[in-house]
Curated annotation (Swiss-Prot):
SUPFAM superfamilies: Winged helix' DNA-binding domain. PROSITE patterns: RFX_DBD (PS51526). It comes from the Eukaryota. The keyword Transcription applies. The gene is rfx2. InterPro entries: DNA-bd_RFX, RFX-like, RFX1_trans_act, WH-like_DNA-bd_sf, WH_DNA-bd_sf. Belongs to the RFX family. Transcription factor that acts as a key regulator of ciliogenesis. Specifically regulates expression of genes required for cilium assembly and function. Recognizes and binds the X-box, a regulatory motif with DNA sequence 5'-GTNRCC(0-3N)RGYAAC-3' present on promoters. Required for neural tube closure and neural ciliogenesis. This is DNA-binding protein RFX2. It is found in: Nucleus; Cytoplasm. PANTHER family: DNA-BINDING PROTEIN RFX2, RFX TRANSCRIPTION FACTOR FAMILY.
């Protein structure tokens, strides 16, 4: 091979001299303005090298792509890079500019957009990274994602997106937030929706105007150049992820998703440790856990694939302290010491904290394992000492036989019931911090499935315990499950009603139909049953119409309903009759609203469907408000208030007047069919008995 005026002309040519038998033509120099031409008759097996430099420049080349044997990634490189072919079967090739999205394979044969250059093109050329002869031709960077400075990000926006200097300066805080909270990392991915949700929360907290999702994607790519996207997840649940970026360890955003199942899978697939530790390891638990990963439940899918659900629950909730057990003058059971009482307090507190931890991570499937581990501890050792957890010598394990004795002990039963009320109320406030806030349907369904499984899980875990203990524990869990079902239903109604309240034409039709209702007739019929003040009823009617006419939002309606409850129950504050007055108000509210709906039905009102939906929502939300007012007045949790009515025999005297108790007792005296049955069944028996008498 000869070098003809090497490097002396901008339009340098490369001459090839082959053997005599080949008689291959020689490429002649061409002017700089002439188009790129390809040598047609080159025989690779007979190309010979002539002494001289083995690297030739082919003019001004904008960008070259190099092959990195270690990273297996193609990367853009500034300047001109030249490669020496290895072996006699390859051709001398100059690789020129190309888009950055080069597939990660070793075959590249492209030549384009080069002015003033004559090249030899081949579709099977290899690029050898080790062929560089001069260090100043090394690639400037690899294709790994790397963060830009704030100035570089603004420059990229102005250059690539055409954003003016004024607009780009307004985005300084947005770009700086990305630099402060995120960093590049290999083998890590973040859901695109999660990152955008973090950004929206940042804008809300700092009173900034957020950009839309598409523009936000441009902001990210201006800061983290080379960022790629991947679609990850199971079929039907896949989401777009940014690949090569993660939260910084010191970012405050970590508290929103600390140790979630997603982070365990994507960022720490091997070394991540479960946050909860059962009191003991059960035989086969590890195998069951491994097998369950192959058959993902809906709850696992929500926790793994929808990390953004974390923003809809209260992960910063503070778990209240438990009260001390009030032993009074009751003697301790035989074989039980105060040390056992203290050990039970410590063990049950840690068990409840583990439950809180699992629910915060939306790992509902672990609740069953927690309960199995707690209620099926090891029996006492032969020497009578308590076993200790091998992983933590400070955490005792109550033997199962002693645990049964303690659960039969009346002061401990009351103490554990109070602790359960605190625990389950905290879980409700974590999962549904705001009953009116929009929640994804997948999260709502996961919560409802969780509530459906609770009673069965606890019953199976306590199958060896006496029925009295199981009944007491399941009663509180039932109240918790019922509360979750009610609140998720209320949330569903709120989202459906929100669309109605935002529709101007529907609101106008509702107002027109409501003005045709004969409220005087409604009041006349309801007064005998409810015995309400006429002035109060008229005021509520006028306020309702005014609020509807103003096309108030759902939040404004919620405030109006809250004011109604305050106004009605204010005369009973501090009185023992407060719970009864609250229940009576719910009955009267429901009766009046049903009378209005009946009138609308008889008049064939066009907005009947909208009124029916609104009525369902307002009845449920009124129940929610009254429930919390009664809990506040009695010093109990809402779970405790509702739990008292789940079992008639344990109904608190605080929530019922003596007249109510005596009336219910006298009605049921002497009827063997009714005694010992739940309230619902008693009502059915009494109804059937009355119909037979008729």
């Amino acid at each position: 091979m000869q070098n003809s005026d090497s490097g002396s002309d901008s339009a340098t040519s490369v001459a090839l001299r082959t053997s005599a038998s080949a008689q291959a033509p020689v490429v002649q120099p061409v002017p700089a303005s002439q188009q790129v031409q390809t040598v047609q008759h080159v025989y690779p097996a007979q190309v010979q090298y002539v002494e001289g430099d083995t690297v030739y420049t082919n003019g001004a080349i904008r960008t070259a792509y190099s092959y990195n044997a270690e990273a297996q990634i193609y990367a853009p490189s500034s300047g001109s890079s030249y490669f020496d072919s290895q072996g006699g079967g390859a051709q001398v090739t100059t690789v020129v500019s190309s888009p950055t999205a080069i597939p990660s394979h070793s075959m590249v044969g492209i030549a384009m957009d080069v002015s003033g250059s004559q090249i030899i093109s081949s579709s099977g050329a290899y690029l050898i990274h080790g062929g560089l002869e001069n260090s100043r031709h090394t690639p400037s960077h690899t294709s790994r994602t790397f963060p830009a400075t704030l100035e570089m990000a603004i420059e990229n926006l102005q250059k690539n997106e055409g954003i003016t200097s004024h607009k780009s300066s307004l985005l300084n805080s947005h770009l700086q937030w990305l630099l402060d909270n995120y960093e590049t990392a290999e083998g890590v991915s973040l859901p695109r929706s999660s990152l955008y949700n973090h950004y929206l929360r940042h804008c809300q907290d700092h009173k900034l105007d957020p950009v839309n999702a598409a523009s936000f994607g441009k902001l990210i790519r201006s800061v983290f150049m080379g960022l790629r996207t991947r679609r990850l997840g199971t079929r039907g649940n896949s989401k777009y992820h940014y690949y090569g970026i993660r939260l910084k360890p010191d970012s405050p955003l970590n508290r929103l998703q600390e140790d979630t199942q997603y982070m365990a899978i994507r960022q720490q697939p091997i070394h991540q440790k479960q946050r909860y530790r059962p009191a003991q390891k059960m035989d086969g638990m590890g195998e069951n856990t491994a097998n369950s990963s192959q058959h993902t439940s809906p709850e696992q899918s929500v926790a793994a694939q929808s990390q953004h659900h974390q923003q809809f629950i209260d992960t910063a909730h503070v778990f209240p302290d438990f009260p001390e057990p009030d032993l009074g003058n009751v003697l301790l059971p035989e074989g039980i010491t105060m040390t056992d009482i203290k050990n039970l307090q410590l063990m049950y507190r840690r068990h409840c904290e583990a439950t809180i931890d699992v629910v915060m991570n939306l790992q509902f499937q672990y609740i069953e394992k927690l309960w199995q581990a707690f209620w099926n501890s090891k029996p006492s050792s032969p020497d009578g000492s308590n076993p200790m957890n091998s992983e933590d010598e400070q955490e005792p394990i109550i033997p199962k036989d002693k645990l049964m004795v303690l659960c039969k002990y009346e002061p401990i039963m009351r103490w554990m019931r109070n602790c359960d009320h605190i625990l389950y109320q905290a879980l409700v406030e974590i999962l549904i911090p705001d009953v009116l806030r929009p929640v994804p349907s997948t999260l709502t369904q996961a919560i409802r499935n969780f509530a459906k499984s609770l009673e069965g899980w606890l019953t199976n875990a306590m199958c060896d315990f006496p029925q009295q203990i199981v009944h007491a524990k399941v009663g509180v869990v039932s109240a918790f499950a019922q509360t979750l079902r009610r609140y998720t239903s209320l949330n569903h109604l709120a989202q459906a009603a929100r669309a109605v309240l935002q529709n101007t034409s529907q609101i106008n039709q509702m107002l027109s139909d409501l003005n045709r209702v004969d409220f005087a007739n409604v009041q006349e019929q309801a007064s005998w049953v409810c015995q309400c003040e006429e002035g109060m009823v008229q005021k509520l009617e006028q306020d309702f119409k005014l609020t509807l006419q103003q096309q108030s939002s759902l939040d404004q309606w919620a405030n109006w309903l809250d004011n109604v409850v305050t106004q009605v129950l204010k005369p009973h504050e501090g009185s023992p009759s407060f719970p009864k007055a609250a229940r009576q108000f719910l009955l009267k509210w429901s009766f009046y609203s049903s009378m209005v709906i009946r009138d609308l039905t008889l008049r064939s009102a066009a907005s009947f469907g909208s009124f029916h939906l609104i009525r369902l929502l307002y009845d449920e939300y009124m129940f929610y408000l009254v429930e919390h007012r009664v809990a506040q007045a009695t010093g109990e949790t809402p779970i405790a208030v509702m739990g008292e009515f789940s079992d008639f025999a344990s109904m608190s005297p605080v929530l019922m007047d003596k007249d109510d108790v005596s009336e219910l007792g006298s009605d049921n005296d002497g009827d063997p069919r009714i005694s010992g049955q739940p309230p619902v069944k008693r009502e059915r028996v009494d109804l059937n008995h009355s119909m037979q008498e008729m």
